[in-house]
Amino acid sequence: MAHAVRALWPHGRAVAWRLGDRPALGLHAQGRAGFTRAAGGSGPAATARKGGPRLLGAAALALGGALGLYHTARWHLRAQDLRAERSASQLSLSSRLQLTLYQYKTCPFCSKVRAFLDFHALPYQVVEVNPVRRAEIKFSSYRKVPIVMAQEGESLQQLNDSSVIISALKTYLVSGQPLADIITYYPPMKAVNDQGKEVTEFCNKYWLMLDEKEAQRMYGGKEARTEEMKWRQWADDWLVHIISPNVYRTPAEALASFDYIVKEGNFGTVEGAMAKYVGAAAMYFISKRLKRRHHLRDDVREDLYEAANKWVAAVGKDRPFMGGQKPNLADLAVYGVLRVMEGLEAFDDLMRHTHIQPWYLRVEKAIAEAPQ
């Protein structure tokens, strides 16, 4: 049962027109000089000379405009071709991967990975792990979820830790490096946590392994890259730790949370019944201990509201997402963590009492509209 309770709490258009205007202006000047020289003439020949430069000027103006339109259309078509080439390149890379995600559906870390995979339209299979027996991941010495198994040709790679999974796969999509090489950039490291327990940490897990040109194309500047990393870590180190005390805040909320966990999870009939009642009672008391460990307020909703509003303030009013016009990895991480509360009282309170709902719905829409 100790494993079961981890299911929701696991650890140039203007340029083109100028190109058209310049010849027209030059020919107009020539036309005015010709008209002055012919002004003393008379008869049909003079009339013809008088009208000829005007016709040439009008023709030149039309030609200049057409040239401008041509260059504009050519520029737009080339831009579309480049976007199509990048999309095709990413599609080609993603089609070379066969991904299997081992998860608990209600785990915030697993939800982060699903948000990333769905937004980037990466096809994957899901294996729902039984939180009690965990037989589905008996092949792995790493016993936490999420785990992603990635088949690339003859190479099969195991990716552990939600942030490593996301960073490695994003690096793969942007750079095209072999995944077997990329995962060597995120070596595991043994450490002892505040409770004296040995844990596995991963170096560089918020860093994408890109060269200078790739990083410039993706971020545009160092500030955007640093900001993304900062808030991805914030989601892991702070936001995720507020979820459990909020969804298990009262006995009724704890029971509702475990009812949701049992419905969405991979439990046997007896296991499900035990998890719903015994697990709910256990997590109600454990959440109190977690509240003290993370120095949360007596009313943990206040910490949840404060965190949500802090995130909204960081995104700001001048951009729809922290990533600008589309979600970046920080947007997807925060969204993925919060999404596990959907359908619970804590989520409804969050939407009512903070300013996060417009941003949340924009991310939800962006993921839903990702090309499949």
Listing of model-derived features with the role each one plays in the protein:
Residues 6-7, 194-358:
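GST-like fold's C-terminal all-alpha helical module
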Residues 1-3, 371-372:
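A positional/structural detector of protein chain ends, strongest at the extreme C-terminus
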Residues 3-9, 13-20, 26-28, 36-268:
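GST-like domain detector, emphasizing the conserved glutathione-binding G-site
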